[in-house]
Amino acid sequence: MTTLTKNSKIIYAGTGRRKTSIARVKLVPGSGKLIINGLPGESYLQFSPNYLRVSYSPLKILGLNKEYDIYVKTEGGGLTGQANAIRLGLARALCRMNPDNRTTLKAEGFLTRDARIKERKKYGLRKARKAPQYSKR
């Protein structure tokens, strides 16, 4: 999905999900800054090197670190889920930008949606699987 903005820059978009987090990623040619929900990416992700590494990993694999600005709107979940959702959305946007990137990103596992979500609590149990203590006598 490529669209033109008012100042005629091409935008590539991708959506990523992880657990209950959703990230809508827009890729614009620029200087390599990451903006998440209107804040710099470093401050939004609490200056955590792990979250930043996860978020930037598709660009680093392709060697496009400082060529694109990334604008993200995220909602739901925690920082881990949001960072992984950003990674998936960014990888999908890079595939839309250049279909040749797909093979590299697929081999690294960046285009695979992690389907694991929280299991629901069942009645009669304390949690999803934890049962109350059983006494035979």
UniProtKB/Swiss-Prot annotation:
Organism: Gracilaria tenuistipitata var. liui (Red alga)
UniProt entry keywords in alphabetical sequence: Chloroplast, Plastid, Ribonucleoprotein, Ribosomal protein
Presence of the UniProt keyword rRNA-binding in the record: no
Pfam entry (one): Ribosomal_S9
Family matches, as InterPro entries: Ribosomal_Su5_D2-typ_SF, Ribosomal_uS9, Ribosomal_uS9_bac/plastid, Ribosomal_uS9_CS, Ribsml_uS5_D2-typ_fold_subgr
HAMAP family linked: Ribosomal_uS9_B
Chief localisation class: plastid
One Gene Ontology molecular-function label: RNA binding
Sections of the chain in a coiled coil: none
Similarity remark: Belongs to the universal ribosomal protein uS9 family.
Subcellular location: Plastid, Chloroplast
Disulphide-bonded residues: none
Gene Ontology biological process: translation
Protein name: Small ribosomal subunit protein uS9c
GO cellular component, as recorded: chloroplast; small ribosomal subunit
